[in-house]
Amino acid sequence: MKDCENHGHSRRKLIRRIFWSIIFVLFIIFLTILLIWAILQPSKPRFILQDATVYAFNVSGNPPNLLTSNFQITLSSRNPNNKIGIYYDRLDVYATYRSQQITFPTSIPPTYQGHKDVDIWSPFVYGTSVPIAPFNGVSLDTDKDNGVVLLIIRADGRVRWKVGTFITGKYHLHVKCPAYINFGNKANGVIVGDNAVKYTFTTSCSVSV
């Protein structure tokens, strides 16, 4: 009986040692990852709105509160990190006017961006008879009459960072790019096809992660 008790005690002691050894190894791995992360100090991706081709931008209704628009934009993203990759798990692009969304979101396919890599996307963003707030409808009509409309091209999504073989959890990504559309002078753009106008911006965007 005594031998059985000693055997059971030794077994429990061995299990405890194995358990704490595993905890210690996991702690060392976690600490190593944190140190690598702190040393590398990942930087946010840099976005530039290169251009926008306007195919349609019409306000209708009485009062004017229905907006139909169709753009194709060119958006570039650069990973400034030397040793950190970026996974874009989701990225939805859309346009806003005075903080109100005026187009449907367009999803960009998930992609991986390596060190110092640059990706360029050219999605279409559009909306058909999108209701806008009455005061925004009046302001939009006025801005068009004055010749210039300021839109904000936004991209919202989620990213993950890759350090070596370690991949972080998901982080929210928010991108805002100002786009001044000059309706009063089409000479500022390039005529594309029958009635589309392409405007070049090379505008740096604000990025938050």
UniProtKB/Swiss-Prot annotation:
On whether Cell membrane is a keyword of this UniProt record, the answer is yes
Q: For this UniProt entry, what's an example GO CC term?
A: plasma membrane
Q: Where is the protein localized?
A: Cell membrane
User: Which of UniProt's keywords are assigned here?
Assistant: Cell membrane, Glycoprotein, Membrane, Plant defense, Transmembrane, Transmembrane helix
**Which residues are noted as glycosylation sites?**
N58
The record lists the membrane-crossing segments as: 18-38
UniProt-listed GO biological process terms = defense response to virus
The record ties this protein, via PANTHER family, to: LATE EMBRYOGENESIS ABUNDANT (LEA) HYDROXYPROLINE-RICH GLYCOPROTEIN FAMILY PROTEIN-RELATED (PTHR31415:SF176), OS05G0367900 PROTEIN (PTHR31415)
Keyword Transmembrane helix assigned: yes
- What lineage is this protein's organism placed in? Eukaryota, Viridiplantae, Streptophyta, Embryophyta, Tracheophyta
Tissue and organ distribution: Expressed in rosette leaves, cauline leaves, stems, and siliques, and at lower levels in roots and flowers.
Q: What induces it?
A: Induced by infection with the cucumber mosaic virus (CMV-Y and CMV-B2 strains).
Source taxon at top rank: Eukaryota
Name of the protein in question: NDR1/HIN1-like protein 1
Q: What function does this protein fulfil?
A: May play a role in plant immunity.
Q: What membrane topology is given?
A: Single-pass membrane protein
